[in-house]
From Swiss-Prot:
Descriptive protein name: Large ribosomal subunit protein uL11z
Annotated organism of origin: Arabidopsis thaliana
PROSITE patterns: RIBOSOMAL_L11
Protein function: Binds directly to 26S ribosomal RNA.
Gene responsible for this protein: RPL12A
Gene Ontology terms for molecular function: mRNA binding; rRNA binding; structural constituent of ribosome; zinc ion binding
GO biological process: translation
Amino acid sequence: MPPKLDPSQIVDVYVRVTGGEVGAASSLAPKIGPLGLAPKKIGEDIAKETAKEWKGLRVTVKLTVQNRQAKVTVVPSAAALVIKALKEPERDRKKVKNIKHNGNISFDDVTEIARIMRPRSIAKELSGTVREILGTCVSVGCTVDGKDPKDIQQEIQDGEVEIPEN
């Protein structure tokens, strides 16, 4: 049998959920059950936390557990931030699957997302992070300032587009 958990110890649990939906308690139970938390209640807390800004988007949620209390923090992926920047109307996730987003976002939005993602990026400079986000735009299927994101990546590579560090 595993050792008993110290209740004052801080434990981080990461869960991938769809915003605004109460996830299956059965998927949460193995992760947070041993920490002495009720999976159903945590599922409702996650749904409440993600309902406003992240409704219908797949996001990672960080649960910080201490003294049998869970604090919910949303850790959005680059794709979730790009889709949110597109400001598309919500869709019923049950009916519409594998959507190609064909909107357009500004280059300023891309740099803003890059600044948010900077701490989690592998790139040395902000320009590298911007190129990572442009790659995500390619995957999502949107354009940036009416251009193909691959073209903008090439312009950054060639030094035609400058990205200020601050």
